[in-house]
């Protein structure tokens, strides 16, 4: 049995294959996932697992150098936005690097998901609970 934090074989596999600047999406239950994207569906029911639970596990395993978030989260889900910023601040301290935060429109965000190595769908049912993680290097 794998000793690391990620037990899901699909998530573990995609993270291990990421190269520098490759992207990985963690999304809510409602984000449309392009047919061309590898879909890893973790959703069990509404809210399970939560966006932050999935993101926490993924970022424990993945080196992150930048993130892309929909601008709309600031207005339509400010509590999650603050939680997300706190998580990214803690991740920066843990990794020892600065994580660039980029904002884009939700429409542009959806288009960019097609370029990601995979889209991990959570059970989150709150608006704009989506993030694109850009892989960094550990050296």
Curated annotation (Swiss-Prot):
Binding residues annotated for substrate, in chain numbering: 28, 106, 128-130
Pathway: Carbohydrate metabolism; D-ribose degradation; D-ribose 5-phosphate from beta-D-ribopyranose: step 1/2
Subunit details: Homodecamer.
Main localization (coarse): cytoplasm
EC number(s) given by UniProt: 5.4.99.62
Active site (record annotation): 20
Similarity section: Belongs to the RbsD / FucU family. RbsD subfamily.
Protein's gene: rbsD
Compartments, record wording: Cytoplasm
Keywords: Carbohydrate metabolism, Cytoplasm, Isomerase
Name listed for the protein in its UniProt record: D-ribose pyranase
Organism: Escherichia coli O81 (strain ED1a)
Pfam families for the chain: RbsD_FucU (PF05025)
Catalyzed reactions: beta-D-ribopyranose = beta-D-ribofuranose
An example Gene Ontology molecular-function term: intramolecular lyase activity
Superkingdom in the source lineage: Bacteria
Function of the protein: Catalyzes the interconversion of beta-pyran and beta-furan forms of D-ribose.
Gene Ontology CC annotation, any one: cytosol
GO terms of biological process kind: D-ribose catabolic process
């Amino acid at each position: 049995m794998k000793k690391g934090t990620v037990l899901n074989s699909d998530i573990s596999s995609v993270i291990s294959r990421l190269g520098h600047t490759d992207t990985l999406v963690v999304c809510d239950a409602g984000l449309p996932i392009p047919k061309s994207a590898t879909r890893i569906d973790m959703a069990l029911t509404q809210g399970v697992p939560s966006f932050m639970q999935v993101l926490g596990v993924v970022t424990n395993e993945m080196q992150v150098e930048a993130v892309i978030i929909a601008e709309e989260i600031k207005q339509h889900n400010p509590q999650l936005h603050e939680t997300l910023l706190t998580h990214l601040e803690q991740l920066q301290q843990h990794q020892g690097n600065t994580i660039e935060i980029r904002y884009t429109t939700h429409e542009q965000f959806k288009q960019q998901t097609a370029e990601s190595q995979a889209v991990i769908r959570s059970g989150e049912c709150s608006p704009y609970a989506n993030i694109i993680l850009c892989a960094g290097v550990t050296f």
